[in-house]
């Protein structure tokens, strides 16, 4: 997508943005986690042209469907959870432009008509980008762009109930939703999304309900915004370099370290 051009935007210097990938199954709470992070950082009330942290969804990069594909999509017979459904070339080009500090226009997608809209959203230079999507880690070229990778791990029954409620609000009937879930969504998650969990630096069970994990991530982003971008890379935060137990609700977690995965989950929740 072409750059939006030169606009009156505050200068941010030449430091490259810190890219954070957020993945997980459909309706796992990825966007909610990102929005909560924005809220805790006080960025949700900042003018979008001056935000230090921005969110971008992989959903913006669905391919333009052919007439035949759109007909199948309207019947719930098109697999939107398959890697081929995404325009990875446009996605990579957009992320590259963001890394270069450019102002970029990103597509908008209509989930009711299953079509890319002519309107675009402008993303202005920021210090941190949260990029969320079901297959954010699937493509290696894109995965390697993230300096921190988070995986939101939510029970399948919870994800299904959320998916049903969300899609019914989009005007779809229950039978079509369930058929699409069993035919495309669930198999695609197991084949394409779940295996990418191994690439995550941090695993967040229960999504936004896991405030221990959210607060830890917010603290790391705050360190980045304060200019100490290498703090987590050094593997030393106040002398803590190994996993530790967080107080409250039986949750445990660990420090984000290069090459080490942190699993922040409840020991009492069945999976």
Swiss-Prot record:
Gene Ontology CC: cytoplasm
Superkingdom as given in the UniProt entry: Eukaryota
EC numbers, comma separated: 2.7.1.48
EC category: transferase
A GO biological process held by the record: CTP salvage
Record's catalysed reaction(s): uridine + ATP = UMP + ADP + H(+); cytidine + ATP = CMP + ADP + H(+)
Region of interest (Disordered), ranges: 241-271
Pathway: Pyrimidine metabolism; CTP biosynthesis via salvage pathway; CTP from cytidine: step 1/3; Pyrimidine metabolism; UMP biosynthesis via salvage pathway; UMP from uridine: step 1/1
Family: Belongs to the uridine kinase family.
Name of this chain's protein: Uridine-cytidine kinase 1-A
Originating organism: Xenopus laevis (African clawed frog)
């Amino acid at each position: 997508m072409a750059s939006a051009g030169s606009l009156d935007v505050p200068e941010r210097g030449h430091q490259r943005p810190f890219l954070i990938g957020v993945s997980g199954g459909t309706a796992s709470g990825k966007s909610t986690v990102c929005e909560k992070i924005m809220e805790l950082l006080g960025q949700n009330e900042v003018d979008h042209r001056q935000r230090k942290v921005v969110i971008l969804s992989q959903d913006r990069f669905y391919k333009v469907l052919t007439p035949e594909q759109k007909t199948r999509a309207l019947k719930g017979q098109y697999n939107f959870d398959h890697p081929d459904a995404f325009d990875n070339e446009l996605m990579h080009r957009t992320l590259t432009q963001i890394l270069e500090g450019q102002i970029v226009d990103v597509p908008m997608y209509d989930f009711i008509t299953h079509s890319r809209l002519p309107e675009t959203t402008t993303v202005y230079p920021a210090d941190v980008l949260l990029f969320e999507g079901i297959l954010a880690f699937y493509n290696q070229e894109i995965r390697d762009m993230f300096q921190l990778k988070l995986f939101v791990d939510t029970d399948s029954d919870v994800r299904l109930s959320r998916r049903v409620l969300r899609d019914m609000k989009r005007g779809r009937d229950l039978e079509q939703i369930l058929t699409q879930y069993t035919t495309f969504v669930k198999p695609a998650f197991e084949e394409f999304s779940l295996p990418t969990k191994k690439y995550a630096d941090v695993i967040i069970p229960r999504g936004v309900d896991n405030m221990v994990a959210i607060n830890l991530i917010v603290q790391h982003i705050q360190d980045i915004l304060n200019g100490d971008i290498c703090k987590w890379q050094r593997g030393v935060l106040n002398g803590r370099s190994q996993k530790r137990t967080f107080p409250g609700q039986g949750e445990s977690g660990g420090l984000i370290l290069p090459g080490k995965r942190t699993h922040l989950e409840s020991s009492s929740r069945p999976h």
